[in-house]
């Protein structure tokens, strides 16, 4: 994933995804692989910032010298199953992109367990909708000020 070339790789995570083993390594396979590619920066940052995957939580790490410039963890809460959960993810991604002045953003889920193919399409649509809405709102507020 780190090979992707862009401004922010945003990873939607649940509280369950953030569980770690006795060695402070992620139990989630996606986060474990990403953390290994980043030399442990993800687990270190999540511990330092007390990031647990709660709704509304986010942390963005700058990555010099790799494909993507930043990796962001966006909290989804206990589980992400409703369109509203994924719309909130999109809104958080748009806010992080605005703060980082990013123009190229990729969004992935740390786990999609329990999501049917149809649910994955609904989730993708909701993320896009939330991102678009928040981007529009940010632009509107910027020009209103």
Regions found by a protein language model. Name each.
Residues 1-145:
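Glycine-/small-residue-enriched capping loops at alpha/beta junctions
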């Amino acid at each position: 994933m780190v090979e992707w070339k862009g401004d922010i790789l945003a990873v939607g995570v649940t509280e369950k995804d953030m569980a770690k083993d006795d060695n402070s390594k992620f139990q989630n396979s996606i986060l474990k692989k990403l953390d290994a590619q980043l030399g442990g920066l993800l687990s270190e940052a999540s511990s330092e910032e007390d990031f647990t995957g709660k709704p509304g939580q986010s942390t963005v790490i700058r990555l010099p010298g790799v494909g993507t410039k930043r990796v962001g963890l966006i909290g989804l809460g206990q589980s992400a199953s409703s369109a509203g959960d994924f719309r909130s993810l999109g809104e958080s991604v748009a806010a992080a992109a605005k703060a980082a002045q990013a123009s190229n953003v990729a969004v992935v889920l740390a786990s999609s367990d329990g999501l049917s193919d149809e649910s994955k399409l609904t989730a993708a649509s909701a993320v896009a909708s939330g991102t678009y809405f928040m981007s529009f709102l940010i632009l509107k507020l910027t020009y209103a000020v």
